[in-house]
Amino acid sequence: MKISIIFFTIASLSIAGCQSNFYTEKDYQPVLKIDSHVHLNRDKKFFEDQAIKDNFLLITLNVDHSDSLSVKQQLDCAIEAKQKYPGKIFYGATFYFDTAGWGTNGWSKKAIAHLNSNISGGAVSVKLWKNIGMTERDKNGKFIMIDDPALKPVIDFIISKNLPITGHLGEPRNCWLPLSEMTVSSDSSYFAANPQYHMFLHPEYPSYEDQIIARDHLLELHPDLKFIGCHLGSLEWNVDELAKRLDKFPNMAVDMAARICHLQYQSSKDRKRVRDFCIKYQDRLLYGTDLSDNDANDRDRLSKWIHETWLDDWKYFTSGDKMTSDKFKGKFEGLQLPKNVVKKIYSENAIRWYKLNVK
């Protein structure tokens, strides 16, 4: 009888110990989390209020994007949120990319002065966007790529300020495919709505490979630059390709914003490969969503969308449940990553890479 009791006790402790290595849905709210890629562009604070409820800190990234608020308006929103929620809201600055005088000392001085003003409010990074490489051209009509020598003074200035660059350079590889061949519906719907960015329709533009080569060359030119590649570094389609860059560039990390569905798609094909990747590169991955408060007129709708997105992602990383996605057909299993890996992805890496003063 005593032997049976001892065996039962040991077995129970073993199961409990195994379970304690992983988070569950019950741990979602108590665990501190950071969404390292959001866009706070409204003054109603619905997004921030939901973040507090879900125990999230936020990094809002300003973007030189003609379809959104101006760089100045975004900066004002970011600083207001940062001041209202000290130690909980952080921002990445940017600058307006004006091609007038491009390639001259005057251009770089003007860009640096603008950027210096924008980071003075306490920016934790500088965001560079896909207009570099996909929109901006010099006076001869040639596309300006991120490794252009004329950008070197700006890059050097950012390094001198000990700030990382958060770079959305290029697009997902799906961008260069027909809509019918894209792997996830979030891409096909986006590029259907934004044909100006659907490179399959614009073969005269730089190729996908051109974008990746230019980004890689930037990192080769500036080995001391801390670089966080947005959207899995535009290598979302293959964790093996991303691993090659993380091996080559020790000062490179990536956020997952708007690309977790690509990890899930790969999980549906080879879960072990994706899980092994996340564990091996656990110090280089930052959780992010690319969520915004553009629909801030409806508090309930916005709050529900944010909460459900965050919770669904948490389940994918922490559980081994069978799941489906509305972005592709088929089933996949959650990665059930160990607690220490989840903590790094969800908070510790963002704190370290962005040097956050969390309160």
Give each language-model segment a name:
Residues 18-20, 24-26, 75-198, 203, ...:
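Active-site gating/metal-coordination segments in enzymes
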Residues 5-16:
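Bacterial N-terminal signal peptides
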Residues 203, 207-217, 222, 226-359:
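H/E-rich (His + Asp/Glu) clusters that bind or coordinate divalent metals
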Residues 1, 16-27, 358-359:
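Basic/polar N-terminal segments that are highly enriched at the extreme N-terminus
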Residues 19-88, 109:
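An N-terminally biased module of ancient metal coordination in phosphate/nucleic-acid-related enzymes
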Residues 50-51, 118, 158, 218, ...:
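Generic structural signal for hydrophobic
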Residues 37-45, 64-74, 98-109, 136, ...:
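Acidic-and-aromatic substrate-binding clefts and catalytic sites of carbohydrate-active enzymes
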Residues 34-38, 58-61, 89-94, 126-128, ...:
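Hydrophobic faces of well-ordered beta-strands that scaffold small-molecule active sites
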